[in-house]
Each structure stands twice: as C-alpha cells, then as structure tokens.
Amino acid sequence: MILEKPSWIRHEGLQIFSIDIQTGGLRFATGGGDQKVRIWSMESVHKDNTNNDSKQRLLATLRDHFGSVNCVRWAKHGRYLASGSDDQVILIHERKAGSGTSEFGSGEPPDAENWKVIMTWRGHTADVVDLSWSPDDSTLASGSLDNTIHIWNMNNGICTAVLRGHTSLVKGVTWDPIGSFIASQSDDKTVMIWRTSDWSLAHKTEGHWTKSLGSTFFRRLAWSPCCHFITTTHGFQKPRHSAPVLERGEWAATFDFLGHNAPIVVVKFNNSTFRKNFSSDQDPKAAPVGWANGASKTPTKEQQPYNVIAIGSQDRTITVWTTASARPLFVARHFFSQSVVDLSWSPDGYSLFACSLDGSAANFHFEVKELGHRLSDSEMDEWKRNRYGDVGGRQSNLAESPAQLLLEQASAKQSAGEKVTSIVEQGKAPPKVSAGVPNPGLVVLSLEVPEVSHEDSKKTAGPTADDVKKGNQLSSPVKQREYRRPDGRKRIIPEAVGFASNQDNIPNHSQNHPVNFSSLDQRMNGTKPSYGSNSNSNNCGVKDRTSVTARANITESLVIQKASAGAGNDGRLSIEHTRSMAPSSLTPCSALSIHVINKNGNEDALPVCLEARPVERGAGDMIGVGALSTKETEIKCIKGTKTLWSDRISGKVTVLAGNANFWAVGCEDGFLQVYTRCGVRAMPAMMMGSAAVFIDCDDSWKLLLVTGRGLMYIWNLYDRACILHDSLASLVASPDESSAKDAGTVKVISATFSRCGSPLVALASRHAFLYDMSLKCWLRIADDCFPASNFASSFSFPQGGELGKLQIDIGKFMARKPIWSRVTDDGLQTRAHLENQLASSLALKSAQEYRQCLLSYVRFLAREADESRLREVCESFLGPPMGKVGSASPTDPKNLAWDPDVLGMKKHKLLKEDILPSMASNRKVQRLLNEFMDLLLEYETDVTLIPQPGTEGNGNGNDKVMTS
C-alpha cells in the first residue's frame, strides 16, 4: 500500500467539501470553501513532487459559483462535470477547445484546459449538498437543504420532477446502478427509496437512525455495484457509531459497519467487484467449472465475489471494508485534523481519494493482493443480467405513440425563458408616458398635437403598447441578498432582477415621475408642497418623451391611514401628502417639458407646451380692502415661440394632464379646471373637496383623478359623465390584520390608466391593484406573497409588458426583505404564483404575457405530473363537444358560454401549438396528452364536415362543406 497526502491539493487554505475522480482516470476534481471548482491531473499524484511542474498539476480553476462548492461529480462518460453550491445553483461544465483563462488580478498563469459552463440549473431554494448521475448520464439527481430532491434532464436542461417527502434537510442522494431507484437520506433520520419510472415513493425506512447523535455536514450514502445493498450513514449502535446496510427488496437493515467513534459522514463503494486471490495451484483459469472432473457446480466460498467499501467519519478516520470479512481491511488514523467529508475510488478500483474539512486531500493506493482480483466489466454485466434481467430499457419511460416523440421534439425547442412574440396584431397607437415635476413652482406640459377636427378627435383611439428603449435592454447590475446562518457565518447570494430600468421602483408608464427609494424613506410627513422647493435636480431641462398624452404631478405619494374605531370618526380616512425635499444648495430647474412625436408623420409640427407658472402678488398690487397677499398661477399654452392662449387661476397647481382633445389642471385648493384644446373653459371649476394628487388621461376623452382624501374619479369629458367614483379605502388593511408599525396605513405612489383602460394603482409596498369595472372591486395583480416561488425573481416576460415591469419591481423590493424559511414549500408557492400571474395578465388584457404565463404554468404542471389541473386547462381550451357550442343547458358549467378566443388568440391554436407540446416534456402524462390530441383531431374533423350557412337543403346533393 502507498499512502500519499499531496500538499499542493488545496483551496486557498479553506475547506475541501468534495472530491471525485473522472471515469477515464486522467483527472480528478475538488470543490471547496473558496467558491471554486479545481480540476487536477491524476498523473501528477504518483510523480515525484519535487520534479513535477506545478503547471501540470492544476489543469483548470472554475470560478462560476457564488457560494461554497459542496459537491462535484463526474458523469460516467467523463465529458461533463456537475457542481452544486451554497448559491442554490447546479452547473454543468464541459471541456472546450483551446486553453483557459486566468482570474484578473490573481497573478496566476492561464488554465491549461478550457472548461466552460454549458448548463445552469436553478430551482432549489437552499444549499445544494449532493449530486448523483444516472447510469446512462441522461439525468442528474440533486439533494438540497430545502428538503427536496430535484431530477434534471440533460437533454433539455429541464427539471422533470421534484421529490418531496423528507421533513428535514436532504444531505445525501445516490442512484441505483441499474437505474430503477434513487435513495436519499435526510436529517429527519429516514432513508427514502424512490422509483424512477414514475418518481413515486417506493419505501420509507426509519428507526435505524433514531439514536444517532450530533449533526454532520453531509449524509452521503452509497449503492453497491452489485445493486443489492445500500450503505447509509450516521447510524448508532451503542456504544459505537455505525453505517447501517439496507438490502434491496425489503429495504430493511441487515447488518451494520461498526467501529467509528463519531458520526459517519460519507460511505463510498468501490466501482468494481472483487474476487479473492488464488495461489499458483488455484489459478482461476485452470479451475474446473461445472461437473467436469467431479468439480462442484457452484463456486466455492473463496471464489464468491465481494464488494469493497470505504467509510469516512467525523473522528477523522477512514476505514476500508470488504463484504467478505467482519473486520475492516484497513484503518487510516491521524491523516486529517478535521472530519472526512468525501471519498472517491479510481476507475481501476485500487486507489482511494479522500478530502477533509481541514483543507487537505489524501490518496491511498492498494495492491492486488490486498483487495483481490477485480471482475471485468463483461463479468459484472453478465452477473447483473442473470440477476435483474436486461436493464437497458429501465432508464426512462417508453413513448406510447409516435405523436409523443414529435411533441417532445417541439417541447425541446420551447425554452422556459424564450422570447414569445405576439400572436395578435398589436395596435399602432403610441403609448403614454409620465414625467416628474422638479420644480413645484413651474409645471410644464408639452404636447405635439396634430391638426385634427373636432369630429375626428371624438373618436376613440385603439389600444396602446409601450415602446421599450434600447437603454432599458441593458442587463441590470447584480443585486444580492445577505443574511447570517445560525452558526454565525454570513451568506451573500447574488440575484438577477431582469432588465435595467431608468427608475428604481415603478416603470415610467405607470408613475408620475421618478421616485428614489432612499427619498421615500426620508420623507417629511405633513409637509405641503411649496413653490421654490426642488424634488429632483437631476430632471433639469427638457425631457424628450414619446407620447400622445401626458401628465405632471407635484405630489410624489399619498399616505392614507384608516383611523381606529375608538377615535370617534367612524373609520374615516386620514390623508397625508408626502414629498421629498431636496437640499437647498441645489439649483431649482426652470422647466420640464414632455415632447410628443406627431404620429401622423408631420415632421414640421412644433411641440405644444402647457405651462403653469406661479404669480406672487403683494398687498400693494391688489385692488380693494385687505393687506394679505394672494397666490395665482398663470396657465400658458405655447407652440414654438407663439403663445396660443393663456389664463390665470387662483391657488397652486398640483397636477396637469392633457391630450389632443383637452387640458386638465388640478389645484391645491381642491378644484379641477378643464380646458378645450383652444383654451376655452369647457365647464365651471369642478370642486373635489381636497387637493388633486394624481391625474392621468387616455388618448380620447377619459380623465382619471385621485384626491387627497383617497377618492378616485374617472370621467368621460365628451359625454360629461362620471364613469367611476370610488375610494382607495379598500386598499388599506385593517389594524388587526397588519403589523403594528403600518397598521391601517397605505402609501400610494402611482395612479394611472392601464393599457386596458382600467385604473392601475401602485403602492409603496410595490403591490399593484387594478380596478375591474365589471366586478366593481380592486384586483391585486402584483404582490410579494410568493417569495419561495421559482419564478419570484427570474420570470422572463415579453419586453414592454405591464405585468413584467411590475414583477421586476416586486423582485427588487423583495431583495430588501428577510429571506423566507428554507422549509417553505416552494412547489406550492410556485404553482400559486404562476396561477396568479396568469389571472393578472388576463385582467390586464396582455396577450403576450398571458401566453408566456400559460406556457410556464403548463410546463410546471407537467413536471409535477398534476393531471387534474392539466385536464382542467386542456378542457377550457378545447371547449364543449362539437354541436353543443351555444346550445348548452344553463346547468352545465363546462359548456356555458364558451368563447373560442382569449385576448384575440384562438384557443385551439394555443392548445395545439403551445399547451400540448409543453405537456410532452414529461412522459408520465403522455396518456392524458394523447387523449386530448385525439379529441382535438376529432373536433377539427367535425368542423370540416359542417355545411356552410345557406348551403343546406339545395336538393341537388352537391352541398358545399366548410374547410378548415
């Protein structure tokens, strides 16, 4: 035996958590606390350290993780290297042509080999601590501290299943060598056996670990190469710690490996099976087999094959056992100063590598006379075939129809983050934009109004859609979450939050002007806006925008408080205006303009600017009795250098809005003045009872206004009718349903029209509400109620969508909140989150976002094999049987008023091109898939046989039919 402890195998003095040898025996990999994966040369281990060049030892350093690397595992074919980390991410590495690179500023030479990440898998909500490849390398199982095991498909990179059943941290996972089962071990002191055919629980073993003491970093169990035994970790048989062995079939502990003085952390079976050595007169080739010359038909006890297993413990000891002996073959003490955490056998079966938390690794090389003769691969395959039959077809479910294979190909082309193009032709009308008012003393609204007649201006424009600027397509800076573990270690997890935004909170289409998060926290309650103060000096000068409507507000937010029942005011609302006060040293801006592009193609059209400027009058300038000064505001409409019209109103102007049809001016005194396009007062001043806080208008005749008392109005100014009069009081949580700090308080930071024409209100908590005109209530379309969802911060929406921008803002706000419990059921939250997003996109009438949410929801249900919900989705898109559409009885909810379209998209087309291919990603639901494929085909066939209207009863026998 040769024992070696190379000093050059290290991770910058930090712990080494995992070690694994490549199948070909050319390389081995380590993962450590320095957040790196290092690939080393096996050839350098057995060479003289003094003569070996250090450049040949370390082949590559992989720096793609943001947390400690807990596990590294080579695929059976040796091409891929998988790594799992504290950053909750699994990376798949592959070697590429050429040489590698070096870390900037490290001073190290470039890597000898070029290894790149080809797949990044996210889905776990806690540390990934163990990995295991399937026998054919098509699937990878990962165990995590979120109590789950995820199954990943290497063909498409999709998580095909999530195994839930453990009630505590999963710290070990291993794959059956013939691919029929997966075994996992957890801190809940159980071992679970899972079927790979349908990912159901085959058996739950408990009782053998109930007396175990202490805790370990890992519980890395192992499956024997003969497929008959599973050796587990962290057992206890008084007075020693043990490694219980489970036997296949009954899954009961038949015996234990005893002797360690501390909990066992890792066990590792040798990849080969051995047979005892023979003397010269007992040559196995010369030994007779069968009945020839009176030899025994069955091999003798000495000829029986056996397994070799290595065990690592917290007592810093490694033992090597054979199943042919009751005592350990080898015991290694005093090699490490801390716990042994991982083991790996070489492909030839005679070298054992071990790593420890002390940051070192050791190699133990055995001789043939110590372990025995290794059985060849053909002998092992023959032995498995005789015992378990042909195992070649056990790796995956078989496709039951050719259509399943075709849909699987279509499903593989669909990626979870693909950019979905719109099915419907979007409207050409330009979007609305908003801008802030840096100087409350001067409010300017600039529009470019085409020359249209009064009759043309009465017509309602079509739907609008935001144009996303190129500047918004840049990747956002990396943000991070930070918290401390119970042991005191600090954990920092970077997060991608989507596209960068010009603002740090609400998108520019749904906010009056940019609001800084820091300023929101430093606002002065009860401070009324005054002339001459500056709220944002960065907005000086003229802002170029693309819009046909515009608005400008002075007030940044509205604080609404619901008074307690004992206050004697019957629960009326108490309102405060809050505004950010800029330092006095900053120079106030003189104006803010919103320029509008003429969509009719008139390049010579000049912008029209509506300006509100305060006018101070002293007592000497007044006519009449009294010495008090009064404040007035001068309203001017300017086109180029020409003043089109002007007017003066008393008081301070707080909000402005306008489009090609009208202008609206709201004042602090609580009245609203509406002007025609030419400056005529369209109606007397409208008294609102309190100051106007938020204002918005569409591109026709609708005007939205929110007052300081939390009342919302929507008018159709052309018909002189009020469409909506409602209060924001329903958005205020009751004092007994919220925290003591924010009981009965809500801060409104935005109120605007959504693209569907309904009012959209955003709160400082980043919750967004849409008012449904049919339901007569508010719908919460964006919130932070799903922190553990897999899509909480990584959902990919089509660019420019309202829901996507709100979701990005929610992700930024959630990054500031404490992390959720690691035992949260992320699967339940993910499903609820997707269902909520699907309903919200439908309420917003956003076709692109609805289709994207639908695809993600169906993929998730297919991964979970949730047939009941998948059936409900398919039935809703398939509709009632042919011939019953429109003639269903009122008592049949399935056939009642079924609409073949949703948001302008054909339901059958969505079912055929999107839903069914997404379901094909999991063969466990292929029977349900085939059922609806047949129903859809039958439906389409029936449609082609229905006579066209007016062609029946011709009597000539040549009735025409409608073709699809």
Swiss-Prot record:
<dbReference type="GO" id="GO:0006351">
    <property type="term" value="P:DNA-templated transcription"/>
</dbReference>
<keyword id="KW-0175">Coiled coil</keyword>
<dbReference type="GO" id="GO:0005634">
    <property type="term" value="C:nucleus"/>
</dbReference>
<feature type="repeat" description="WD 4">
    <location>
        <begin position="165"/>
        <end position="204"/>
    </location>
</feature>
<keyword id="KW-0853">WD repeat</keyword>
<feature type="repeat" description="WD 2">
    <location>
        <begin position="64"/>
        <end position="103"/>
    </location>
</feature>
<dbReference type="GO" id="GO:0006355">
    <property type="term" value="P:regulation of DNA-templated transcription"/>
</dbReference>
<feature type="repeat" description="WD 7">
    <location>
        <begin position="644"/>
        <end position="685"/>
    </location>
</feature>
<dbReference type="InterPro" id="IPR055410">
    <property type="entry name" value="CAF1B_HIR1_beta-prop"/>
</dbReference>
<dbReference type="InterPro" id="IPR011494">
    <property type="entry name" value="HIRA-like_C"/>
</dbReference>
<feature type="region of interest" description="Disordered">
    <location>
        <begin position="453"/>
        <end position="490"/>
    </location>
</feature>
<feature type="coiled-coil region">
    <location>
        <begin position="920"/>
        <end position="940"/>
    </location>
</feature>
<keyword id="KW-0156">Chromatin regulator</keyword>
<protein>
    <recommendedName>
        <fullName>Protein HIRA</fullName>
    </recommendedName>
</protein>
<dbReference type="GO" id="GO:0000785">
    <property type="term" value="C:chromatin"/>
</dbReference>
<dbReference type="GO" id="GO:0006338">
    <property type="term" value="P:chromatin remodeling"/>
</dbReference>
<feature type="compositionally biased region" description="Basic and acidic residues">
    <location>
        <begin position="479"/>
        <end position="490"/>
    </location>
</feature>
<dbReference type="Pfam" id="PF24105">
    <property type="entry name" value="Beta-prop_CAF1B_HIR1"/>
</dbReference>
<dbReference type="InterPro" id="IPR019775">
    <property type="entry name" value="WD40_repeat_CS"/>
</dbReference>
<dbReference type="InterPro" id="IPR015943">
    <property type="entry name" value="WD40/YVTN_repeat-like_dom_sf"/>
</dbReference>
<dbReference type="InterPro" id="IPR036322">
    <property type="entry name" value="WD40_repeat_dom_sf"/>
</dbReference>
<feature type="repeat" description="WD 3">
    <location>
        <begin position="123"/>
        <end position="162"/>
    </location>
</feature>
<comment type="similarity">
    <text>Belongs to the WD repeat HIR1 family.</text>
</comment>
<dbReference type="InterPro" id="IPR001680">
    <property type="entry name" value="WD40_rpt"/>
</dbReference>
<keyword id="KW-0805">Transcription regulation</keyword>
<feature type="repeat" description="WD 1">
    <location>
        <begin position="10"/>
        <end position="50"/>
    </location>
</feature>
<feature type="repeat" description="WD 6">
    <location>
        <begin position="335"/>
        <end position="376"/>
    </location>
</feature>
<keyword id="KW-0804">Transcription</keyword>
<comment type="function">
    <text>Histone chaperone involved in maintining knox genes silencing throughout leaf development.</text>
</comment>
<dbReference type="Pfam" id="PF07569">
    <property type="entry name" value="Hira"/>
</dbReference>
<dbReference type="InterPro" id="IPR031120">
    <property type="entry name" value="HIR1-like"/>
</dbReference>
<comment type="subunit">
    <text>Interacts with RS2.</text>
</comment>
<keyword id="KW-0678">Repressor</keyword>
<feature type="repeat" description="WD 5">
    <location>
        <begin position="259"/>
        <end position="331"/>
    </location>
</feature>
<dbReference type="GO" id="GO:0000417">
    <property type="term" value="C:HIR complex"/>
</dbReference>
<keyword id="KW-0677">Repeat</keyword>
<keyword id="KW-0539">Nucleus</keyword>
